[in-house]
Amino acid sequence: MAVRDEHYKMKLKLSVIAWILASSPAVFALDLQEAYARAQQNDPNWQANVLQYQADQLNLGIASGNLLPTVSLSGNVTRKNQSVNNSESEGLPAEFGELQSSSTTSRQVALTARQPLFRWDAWQGYKQVKTSVELSEVNLRLQKQQHILQVAEAYFNVLRQQSLTTAYLQEEQALSEQLRMMNAKLKEGLVARSEVSEANAQYQSAQANRISTQVQLVLAQEQLAQLIGPYQENLAVLRNDFQFQKPVPSDMQSWTELAQSQNLNILQARLQKRYSEDAKRVEQAALYPQVEAVGTYGYLKQSPATIMSSNGDFDQIGVEVNWNLFSGGRTQKSIRQAGVNVQKSEAQLDAAIRKANTDVKQSFMQVETDQAKLNARKAAMDSSEIVSQASRAQYQEGLKTMVDVLLAQRNAFSAKTDYLNAKYDYLLHVLQLQASVGQLTEKELAELNAWLIEYDSPQSL
């Protein structure tokens, strides 16, 4: 019986560890920096954001075309048929005359150049597009920051689920050993059946937890693969000497000031407000005239030629003015609508400032409390392990019941999972704090990546 139980225990351990690493048999570990580099290449959502940015950059050249000369080539061929009563030329009544028909064919080709002299609408439109290009740059920076957060969250979620799966596996193995011992003692009449039932219940619960985390691990791996593409490598894991790092600067006021000047959502809202103001000026430009210099050079030929024909080259130059004096009230209504949009953007800017202020304070306090939480979780894990070992020893001496041992053991593994969760929560809170002040870049990923090492053994999970 003991040999069979030991065989089952070893088989369970090996099968679960093999399952955890089934999708990552490669020798070299995939670290956080490499994962983000792959996400930049393989994530279609990020590629769409980059392409949208590139398309937005082209708008400036399109808008500048309204301020530059335009040259057009035109041509036409016309045929004119005319009937004339010759009685009029001879001084006779019309009824005595005869109709004479004639036809004339005209061919013309012309080259026309236009240069805006005063196009207030085009100039204001150009300024609006310049603002939109700046807004597009901030949008891409914000999307990049969110992309970094997505990749980091997906990466560390895989590590979290790997660590939890290993912890629950260890608990399941320990409880399996306890259950084996209890069954043996039950046969000898040394323990009550209720204690065996309690041990079995704890074992079934641990097994359910391990299965649940295995499912969560698969889902986490799929989420990461969705961002970076399929991968076969092990993920680099947190070093055993991982330590809490206090945020720099160390006071909340400094972080709040950084957020007010560098938070990307605030910068986005400010540019959106300027864009709305530019849009209002574009609508107001419709009240002004449009002045253009126009020059034309062409060639005209009429056949058959007559004394009245003007065959040959021709050219002309002049100034053309267009002024829309009334458009059914559309212009005034458009101006008022643009004014409302400016007020809307001002309200959105105020909301962005308030939200950034709240977010940075919340993120800073989370990182600050993570220090106390990590220390407390670590102390609880160490002390609960000591209590668990002591309970097992006291059980052997008859001072504790098996229920006491199982409770202490459950508390020890619960403290371990709490500590694991606290570590990964801290890492994500650090990234969120940096994002709240617009400073989450590849540099910050590299600093965090320094705490990762290649997968070494199941205990490293």
Regions of interest found by a model, annotated:
Residues 418-461:
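Acidic, low-complexity, intrinsically disordered peripheral segments
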